Amino acid sequence: MKVKPILSALGSLLVLSAGGPSHLTAGEPGKDAPNILFVAIDDFNDWGPTQLDGAPFEVDTPNFDALADRGILFTNAHCNAPSCNPSRTSIMSGLHPASTGVYANGHDWLANERFDDILLLPEYFQQHGYTTLGGGKIYHANQGNDFNRKGLLSPRGWADFFPSFEEQLPVPSMPDIKPDHGEGNFNWGGTGKPLEDMGDHKVVNWAIDQLETPQDKPLFLAVGIYRPHMPWF
């Protein structure tokens, strides 16, 4: 398998529109409806793009700069919660955790009836004539110590999802040695595996394939990057 470099991959994901909002009616995308790329990155610090002032690190981020130049840059965006599940549920529903009732990673929002009548982000685009594709960590993923589960992925609004609706994340390569102190579920260290075995590479390569596939409708593509969540990679 030929590895597609992660920086080149990110550089290829430049489809955000900087145009004004389209006034759409359900099921009918506007004539100039843009393709929309939604990228979620876990545990990401405020590195770049360089258009942002006050970053604590001086890091060159040419691909983020390119995204900012060709897309929409929010300079005053904030996270509604400091943990994964309430934050991602808030983003995908458009509601504050005080409204969703999701305050912790263990809260199963899929079992909450209040979401039955809430329009989720991919549902909105699907109802307005978009092809909606998702892959990787979009909703909160891991439950307990099981890294091969769909987590809290909702199938609502997606035409397709990678790897599948039953497995939100590709199974990650992890060190084989377990901690000897009885806590945690993996040891610190490298895996000895090639980059193409890493879940994020699989997700990004899948996303590039979708971008290279001709679409007969505007595309909403959600790409969830799991790293740098883990400290060892």
Label each region the model flagged.
Residues 1-5:
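Positively charged n-region of N-terminal signal peptides that target proteins for export
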Residues 6-14, 19-233:
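Formylglycine-dependent sulfatase
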